[in-house]
Amino acid sequence: MHKTEAQTYLLYDRTLLLLTMGLVGIGLVMVISTSMPIGVRLSEDPFYFARRYAFYLGLAVVLSLVTLGIPMASWQRGSSLILLITLIMLLLVLIAGQSVNGAVRWLALGPWRIQPAELSKLALFCYLASYLVRKAEEVRTNFWGFCKPIGVMVLLAILLLAQPDLGTVLVLFITTLAMLFLAEAKIWQFLPIIGTGILAVMLLIIAKPYRRRRVTSFLNPWDDPFGRGYQLTNSLIAFGRGELWGQGLGNSIQKFEYLTEAHTDFICSILGEELGYFGVLLALLMVFLVAFRAMSIGRKALAINQIFSGFLACSIGIWFSFQTMVNVGAAAGMLPTKGLTLPFISYGGSSMLIMLTAIVLLIRIDFETRLAKLQAFVR
């Protein structure tokens, strides 16, 4: 068999796997670098957060090996159950959740915490993909069929906003609309939903003083650099110090608790300070290449009528792209802060578990697509 023929029969996406491994490697290095100061302050252990990150990474790898063996047909059949479990977990958060910085988003399992909001993304997208398998024609021809998945998203949004978690709600909203667009819903159906969504976001911002402060500080952070603009000004200072090539790995000053949440929501700022604009550009290029591979895998699955797999893969690509744009946009002062992680790079156990599960689903979808083509060729 010639080399080109051997590549044709490769039954997994090697590019996707290598990109993911690269991003996880960058994430591990940056979490070690950014979390040392806060680790020393909280536990007198500079590697406290690095150890936890490594634990979650190991757990994610084990979970991924299990997930890889589950056929996509099983995910389709279990999508409603996954959504139901997610709804129950979100309710439990409101009843017995742990509060951090005024937000109740975590369930405690001994010394570990899980964030059901992260699971809500994958659960909703699995459910929507399953819904589109059954009701694609109804979505295209009937406004009620279009509104049903929006209703499910709104139910999740209500529970998430009670935590509160507007950032996750925006990810769910944008990705849901994008999936319906890919399902060829009529443009006029989107107009009232988008209008209502914009109005709802404006009202939510007005209703909470801390959200208003985020918007005003985003518009002019230098007006109050030691008050409501403190976080953003320090983020911009980090980018400014990094310039093109950065100060060198480990040489950030802003991570010494000038910039809070340096290892989570604002890790991109420290990445820019230590590795420069070049380092940020490389990391973003890798994330968007992962998203592009997801969309490509989805397109190929749809082409051979694997509808559930195709829509799920596309939703993962849209999710990663939008979340990355919001995270980097907030760190660079182009968007108000939303509390979303930078995929695979920010510290966050629940985020790591869910996003690596999503990657494994992409690999499984691609495997089934390639296998179906190979079997058709053999026949």
Swiss-Prot record:
TM segment ranges: 16-36, 53-73, 80-100, 114-133, 140-162, 166-183, 187-207, 270-290, 302-322, 343-363
Classification via Pfam families: FTSW_RODA_SPOVE (PF01098)
GO biological process: cell wall organization; FtsZ-dependent cytokinesis; peptidoglycan biosynthetic process; regulation of cell shape
EC number: 2.4.99.28
Subcellular location: Cell inner membrane
Membrane topology: Multi-pass membrane protein
Topological domain ranges for the Cytoplasmic compartment: 1-15, 74-79, 134-139, 184-186, 291-301, 364-379
PROSITE patterns linked to this entry: FTSW_RODA_SPOVE (PS00428)
Keyword Cell wall biogenesis/degradation: yes
Segments in the Periplasmic topological domain: 37-52, 101-113, 163-165, 208-269, 323-342
Enzyme class: transferase
UniProt pathway: Cell wall biogenesis; peptidoglycan biosynthesis
GO molecular function: lipid-linked peptidoglycan transporter activity; peptidoglycan glycosyltransferase activity
Keywords (A to Z) from UniProt: Cell cycle, Cell division, Cell inner membrane, Cell membrane, Cell shape, Cell wall biogenesis/degradation, Glycosyltransferase, Membrane, Peptidoglycan synthesis, Transferase, Transmembrane, Transmembrane helix
Catalytic activity, as annotated: [GlcNAc-(1->4)-Mur2Ac(oyl-L-Ala-gamma-D-Glu-L-Lys-D-Ala-D-Ala)](n)-di-trans,octa-cis-undecaprenyl diphosphate + beta-D-GlcNAc-(1->4)-Mur2Ac(oyl-L-Ala-gamma-D-Glu-L-Lys-D-Ala-D-Ala)-di-trans,octa-cis-undecaprenyl diphosphate = [GlcNAc-(1->4)-Mur2Ac(oyl-L-Ala-gamma-D-Glu-L-Lys-D-Ala-D-Ala)](n+1)-di-trans,octa-cis-undecaprenyl diphosphate + di-trans,octa-cis-undecaprenyl diphosphate + H(+)
Matches recorded under InterPro entries: Cell_cycle_FtsW-rel_CS, FtsW, FtsW/RodA
GO cellular component: cell division site; plasma membrane
Family: Belongs to the SEDS family. FtsW subfamily.
Function: Peptidoglycan polymerase that is essential for cell division.
UniProt-recorded name of the protein: Probable peptidoglycan glycosyltransferase FtsW
Lineage: Bacteria, Pseudomonadati, Pseudomonadota, Gammaproteobacteria, Enterobacterales
